[in-house]
A protein has these predicted regions:
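Transmembrane alpha-helical segments that form core, pore/gating elements
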Residues: 9-12, 74-76, 80, 111-168
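Small-residue-rich packing faces within the transmembrane alpha-helices of Major Facilitator Superfamily
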Residues: 5-12, 72, 98, 155-159, ...
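Hydrophobic/small/kink-forming positions within alpha-helical transmembrane segments
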Residues: 40-45, 49, 71-76, 102, ...
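Hydrophobic transmembrane alpha-helices of multi-pass small-molecule transport proteins
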Residues: 12, 37, 86-108, 161, ...
């Protein structure tokens, strides 16, 4: 929560330094304000909160599989809104991405999915929130810029979570390592990751961007192998191939 607020303030200061007037233009129209608040609360804040609660009530693999059903929700919504059936290559890419995520998260063993009613509710809620995170800010970013929208969204989401979670009650020891770790989370894990992804949403649309984001479990798997010494199983290679195949298909589709 504190990271979100800090990251939001840094982004807004960047916007203020370059274009002071544009920073507050987003608050002029009621419709824009409503979308921004919905994005900050349900897109930014609730997306992460629901995912971590799903992890807490089950495990990371189960929560990841449930959250990455979001591309299905996004593709269905975009199809209905545009009154257009997705292309076959898009549907195949969707199957490969979701299937690949399932294999990486569970290693192909369905018994690794610990799904209680509570987990199912929070996991699907995180998928819906992830879809909203992709769909809500599209028009806002085109009008006001990615940095401006993400900055306000992070600040709103961070304040919203602070009201309920109260991070200032958390007791911890601050040393140089804590400061460096916090700086890395804010600069790389929050500002860089969120802004680059949302710029991708602005450029290619929510449906394709959410499928490209399926590369995240691939990266997480490699990090686990490199830094934690986890074994990379054969089924993981199949999941990896499925996700990368989906990304390649979408890349070729974009070129066409």
């Amino acid at each position: 929560m504190a990271c979100k607020c800090a990251a939001g303030l840094i982004l807004l200061l960047t916007v203020w330094a370059k274009q002071k007037k544009q920073m507050f233009e987003i608050w002029r129209e009621k419709r824009d304000v409503f979308q921004l608040i919905m994005f900050g609360i349900f897109g930014m804040a609730f997306c992460q909160l629901s995912y971590y609660v799903a992890v807490e009530t089950s495990n990371a693999g189960t929560a990841t599989v449930l959250q990455y059903t979001a591309p299905i929700i996004i593709m269905l919504y975009v199809s209905v809104r545009n009154k257009k059936v997705p292309q076959r290559i898009e549907m195949l890419a969707l199957v490969l991405a979701v299937g690949g995520t399932f294999l990486l998260a569970t290693h192909g063993n369905i018994t690794n999915l610990a799904i209680s009613t509570e987990t199912l509710v929070w996991g699907l809620a995180s998928a819906v929130a992830m879809a909203l995170y992709n769909l809500i800010p599209g028009e806002l970013m085109k009008k006001f810029g990615t940095f401006n929208v993400i900055g306000w969204g992070m600040l709103i989401g961070g304040i919203f979570l602070c009201v309920f979670i109260k991070p200032w009650h958390v007791i911890g020891m601050w040393d140089i390592y804590t400061v460096l770790a916090m700086a890395a989370v804010i600069l790389v894990g929050t500002i860089l990751s969120f802004t680059t992804y949302m710029e991708g949403v602005r450029l290619i649309g929510a449906s394709k961007a959410s499928l490209f984001a399926s590369v995240e479990p691939v990266t997480a798997t490699f990090m686990t192998v490199v830094f934690m010494g986890a074994a990379f199983q054969f089924v993981d290679f199949i999941g990896l191939a499925g996700i990368l195949g989906a990304v390649l298909m979408l890349s070729l589709l974009k070129k066409e």
